[in-house]
Amino acid sequence: MPPPFAPCCVIFPAETFTMTTLADCRALDAQDPLRALRDQFTIPADVLYLDGNSLGVMPKAAPARIAEVVTQEWGVGLIRSWNTASWFDLPQRLGDKVARLIGAAPGEVVCTDSTSVNLYKVLFAALSQQKDSGRKLVISERSNFPTDLYIAESLCRERGFTLKLIDASELPAVLTDEVAVLMLTHVNYRTGAMHDMKAITAAAHAAGALTVWDLAHSAGAVPVALNDSNADYAIGCGYKYLNGGPGAPAFAWVNTRHAGQFEQPLSGWWGHAAPFEFTPHYRPAPGVGRYLCGTQPIIALAGLECGLDTVLAAEAFNKDQGAMAALRTKSLALTDLFIKLVEERCAGQGLSLITPRDHAQRGSQVCLSREEGAYAIVQALIARGVIGDYRAGDSQMPDILRFGFTPLYIGFEDVWNSVEHLVQVLETGEWRRAEFNRKNAVT
């Protein structure tokens, strides 16, 4: 199996291109069948928002819905709203909406807790299934998102397993009979590189390992087919491409073949088969309901539902294959355009493309690295209203400028204007100003 992305290589050779113009971008917007979906969001007029891979944009429906929950359902309905406003069913009802975006079936997903907490639960479950197998290795990528590695380190230490970190190029050779669980993030947060979930899952199963997939940069961004890929466990984020708001509840999925074996390490009362019987001993709820732990955050779930509905609105544009098929077509066109414009207009500025050109290996973001000034360049862009973000490099890769492309609210003219600002920041040396080189607490 080939690695999911090519090694970092300097781009923007001095070649002759058929230049793309602003008029071309405006023509693409005029032809875009999804352009009306932008009207679902509140976006400041002076902002070009390319950071939906960190925090999605606020849906217009969210403030009114949250106010309704606070003033009516809580303020007037009070505790009755657990029944009359269907609060009790929210984790499963929202889970069914997520299922439509990740290739899962109704009743297989719940929205609850954070990504980190849900990862703890599903990885614990996978390790419990393998506890008598003699397998002691958990495999993950060295470049995985740190919280995943921290959770895995903690669980491996507690459960007597060993975490082994690899490079993507080592798959599938590293999948030996010592491996209990393969834990991967579907789309890499630093590079935008996307794994072939179906092929890797098949290789893991052939080696006797279970798979845990993190969909934080996939759900709402790219088509995901959990059941078709025969994956074992998955978790994902609610506040990125799903537009659920800061700190929105995450989600968890388990393949139905494991549902009866899932061992809940956080056996709170909300995951009990009959929580309002108040019995002294835990009896897990059937199926995915046992993923729940404590009383659910109703106001946050209401905000998440508004975000989910913005994504599901794209189903109308591809009724056969669903929302993600429609969004994926535009996402690839946006990222292709961004790469092309940067190649045309930023040659000689020291940028390197680290996101795969191959559509089959690319998420919904474009990442560029630079030996000097990546953080300051991002800050200078933000000061101009072009919001992307920065991620620190390592011994194998310089610092990174990340740009997320959410087709629900980004247009082709937005891409043109963003690159125009990037050109100006680079050519004028604006990024060298002192205020852009002072690190903020959140980068």
Kindly give the residue locations of the regions a language model identified.
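Cysteine-centered motifs
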Residues: 8-9
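Pyridoxal 5′-phosphate
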Residues: 12-443
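Arg/Lys-rich, positively charged N-terminal/basic patches that mediate binding to nucleic acids
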Residues: 5
